[in-house]
């Protein structure tokens, strides 16, 4: 399959959330598998999740494999898994400084939703809850994750359409 052009939608109406969407030239079932299968997720997201699975109510951890971020542990709590509709987890946004203990901070909620458009899958991601992140690092977390989600939406699109 070939990839269709990316349709990105950005909402900056709130400092509390990041929203991104992309149209992927693949069926919902294929995009869902790339999201909900932990090993496939790791393949496009850049995290070592071999042998792991995403189950609602459970924590999942794996080492980031993106150059320059190998010291970071991807640490998420799986909130909801609604097959071919919604996948969500909580995490500490842009928690990359090994000298900082982020465990006492609130988390943000990352929600992926999928919609069949008849021409492919509209995949949307919303990360919300930034208003609860400590002020000292909130703007950097929003800035870095905004760029991160733009890249990750391209990554999943490329992964799904070339695998």
Identify what each model region corresponds to:
Residues 1-19:
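Short acidic N-proximal helix/loop "leader" segments that mark the beginning
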Residues 2, 129-163:
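A conserved amphipathic terminal alpha-helix motif
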Residues 19, 39-73, 86:
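Short beta-edge strand/loop motif at the mouth of beta-sheet-based domains
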Residues 22, 73-80, 107-115:
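Hydrophobic/aromatic beta-strand elements that line small-molecule binding cavities or substrate pockets
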Residues 25-44:
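Amphipathic alpha-helical segments
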Residues 28-29, 79-87, 113-122:
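A short, structured loop/turn motif at beta-sheet edges
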Residues 31-32, 41, 60-62, 78, ...:
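Hydrophobic pocket/interface hotspot
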Residues 92-97, 126-133:
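Short, solvent-exposed aromatic-acidic interface loops
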């Amino acid at each position: 399959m070939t990839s269709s052009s990316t349709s990105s939608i950005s909402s900056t109406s709130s400092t509390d959330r990041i929203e991104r969407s992309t149209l992927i030239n693949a069926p919902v079932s294929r995009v869902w598998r790339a999201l909900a299968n932990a090993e496939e997720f790791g393949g496009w997201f850049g995290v070592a999740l071999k042998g792991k699975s995403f189950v609602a109510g459970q924590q999942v951890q794996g080492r980031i494999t993106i150059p320059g971020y190998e010291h970071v542990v991807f640490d998420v709590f799986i909130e909801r898994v609604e097959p071919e509709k919604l996948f969500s987890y909580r995490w500490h946004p842009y928690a990359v400084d090994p000298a900082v203990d982020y465990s006492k901070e609130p988390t943000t909620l990352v929600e992926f939703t999928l919609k069949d458009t008849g021409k492919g899958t509209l995949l949307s991601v919303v990360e919300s809850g930034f208003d609860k992140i400590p002020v000292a690092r909130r703007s950097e977390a929003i800035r870095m994750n905004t760029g991160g989600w733009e890249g990750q939406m391209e990554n999943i699109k490329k992964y799904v359409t070339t695998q």
